[in-house]
Swiss-Prot record:
Name the record gives this protein: Elongation factor Tu
GO CC terms of this entry: cytoplasm
Binding positions (GTP): 19-26, 81-85, 136-139
Coiled coil: none
Domain tr-type G residues, every copy: 10-206
PROSITE patterns named among the record's database cross-references: G_TR_1, G_TR_2
Region called G4, residue ranges: 136-139
GTP-binding listed as a keyword: yes
Region (G5): 174-176
């Protein structure tokens, strides 16, 4: 049979399963794909196909991730599931799998466990905006009061990490029953309830092209008689000829006007997210712009030097450091297109960070970078990547 052409008529949303080991994340992933494939078309996935997740590299870090696609009545979903806890940590921090929302799987028989808490904290730190809970293995709990207790515990845990615990949809079911074809409340019905929650609780994400204009500077040229051209890939939004823009980061912010957009040596009247373009800037000298700055819509993004971040430090096997680092460690932080030196302050209870650890840190950079919460960065030493991180909170 010929492979069906992928019709993207429905809006696209990225989700993933998170939660403690053996609470049923992969079984649920298989159950969702199987139940929804039968109803809306698509490929059913077996547990083993998902569990044998292939290795991929993101920012030089090896991560095992399984990708599954499925459709609901209203949307197309891309869903990530990781086999091991370390893979989740790496995935969420590097943004290899950007999630518009997460499905937290928690066993009704066990209640919240250490990784349940850690994944909720990670989701908060890396900016996963929405969490839906699937209370799994409900077929193993016959005491309604116990179910209520577990639900309460999960809601409290979500609230503790600044998610709206009281308003979070919690679906009770059994991924195993659903995967076995059970049509009851805990089986297929629960999966359809989960699909409804995904459709209604997670808003459709803004497309990159609808965002405010932002382009990291990759290169700067001077063209005699025409002025200064800055090249890069537009990260989000649209830039039209004649629009005023700001140059932000490293130096004091300045305003300029875009007088031309070039792509593949052709002149255009606008450039948009995803385009590799050259922008001609009026009255800007070549030495006024450098790699590592960004061009953006005036007032939309500010330069900062001080922030907290969640970082993963590569293990020795991943080509990272062989030794731990301590407070006031000063590596380079690679943001978008350039390195900036910064010093790391560790949490009070942490004396050192070992290769392979993840940790919350406070960073002070020596030069300001155009920064927003959720921005990803690499930590480097002499051009070699030793860690990956994400901006959790801007301090000033």
């Amino acid at each position: 049979m010929a492979k069906e052409k992928f019709e993207r008529t429905k809006p696209h949303v990225n989700v993933g399963t998170i939660g403690h080991v053996d609470h049923g994340k992969t079984t649920l992933t298989a159950a969702i794909a199987t139940v929804l494939a039968a109803k809306f078309g698509g490929a059913a996935k077996k547990y083993d196909e998902i569990d044998a997740a292939p290795e991929e590299k993101a920012r030089g870090i090896t991560i095992n991730t399984a990708h599954v696609e499925y459709e609901t009545a209203n949307r197309h979903y891309a869903h990530v599931d990781c086999p091991g806890h370390a893979d989740y940590v790496k995935n969420m921090i590097t943004g290899a799998a950007q999630m518009d929302g997460a499905i937290l799987v928690c066993s009704a028989a066990d209640g919240p466990m250490p990784q349940t808490r850690e994944h909720i904290l990670l989701a908060r730190q890396v900016g996963v905006p929405y969490i839906i809970v699937f209370l799994n293995k409900c077929d193993m709990v016959d005491d309604a009061e116990l179910l209520e207790l577990v639900e309460m515990e999960v809601r409290e845990l979500l609230s503790k990490y600044e998610f709206p615990g009281d308003d979070t949809p919690i679906i009770k079911g059994s991924a195993k029953l659903a995967l076995e074809g059970d049509k009851g409340e805990l089986g297929e019905v629960a999966i359809m309830n989960l699909a409804d929650a995904l459709d209604t609780y997670i808003p459709t994400p803004e497309r990159a092209v609808d965002g405010t204009f932002l382009m990291p500077v990759e290169d700067v040229f001077s063209i005699s008689g025409r002025g200064t051209v800055v090249t890069g890939r537009i990260e989000r939004g649209v830039i039209k000829v004649g629009e005023e823009i700001e140059i932000v980061g490293i130096r004091p912010t300045v305003k300029t006007t875009c007088t031309g957009v070039e792509m593949f040596r052709k002149l255009l009247d606008q450039g948009q997210a995803g385009d590799n373009v050259g922008l001609l800037l009026r009255g800007t000298k070549r030495e006024d712009v450098e790699r590592g700055q960004v061009l953006c819509k005036p007032g939309s993004i500010k330069p900062h030097t001080h922030f907290t971040g969640e970082v993963y430090i590569l293990s020795k096997d991943e080509g990272g450091r062989h030794t731990p680092f301590f407070n006031n460690y000063r590596p380079q932080f690679y943001f978008r297109t350039t390195d900036v030196t910064g010093s790391i302050e560790l949490p009070a209870d942490k004396e050192m960070v070992m290769p392979g650890d993840n940790v919350s840190i406070t960073v002070k950079l020596i030069a300001p970078i155009a920064m927003e919460e959720g921005l990803r960065f690499a930590i480097r030493e002499g051009g070699r990547t030793v860690g990956a991180g994400v901006v959790a909170k801007i301090l000033d």
